[in-house]
Amino acid sequence: MAALNGLVLLLLTISAMFISECYSSGESQSIQRKGQCEEVICHRKLNHLGERVTSGCPTGCLCVIREPDNVDNANGTCYALMSSTTTTTTTPDGTTTSEEEE
């Protein structure tokens, strides 16, 4: 009976180590931004008409500002927007289908 308890304890220890290794490797990977939006700073400020404007991000990027909405002068970070393409297919009988791909 003691040998069976030892075997169960050994199996639990091995499975706990395996699960711990799986979770710790996932936490250490960072999100890497690549492309035109990488390391681009954007700005929110008031223009000459007193309206809030956001500038600094290239086309296809979104400016994310981590300040409250009541703060007019703030800096943010540009992130790439998810892009999708549409594929249009025409069959021999003349029907057309469109599919969006991400």
Swiss-Prot record:
Spans through the membrane: none
Annotated GO CC locations: extracellular region
Organ and tissue specificity: Expressed in salivary glands.
Disulfide bonds: C37-C61, C42-C63, C57-C78
UniProt keyword annotations, A-Z: Complement system impairing toxin, Disulfide bond, Secreted, Signal, Toxin
Entry's family note: Belongs to the RaCI family.
The protein's role, per its UniProt record: Complement inhibitor. Prevents complement-mediated C5 activation by binding to C5. Binds C5 at a different binding site than the other tick complement inhibitors OmCI and CirpT1, and the drug eculizumab. Inhibits complement in human and guinea pig but not in other species tested (rabbit, rat, mouse, and pig).
Protein's UniProt name: Complement inhibitor RaCI3
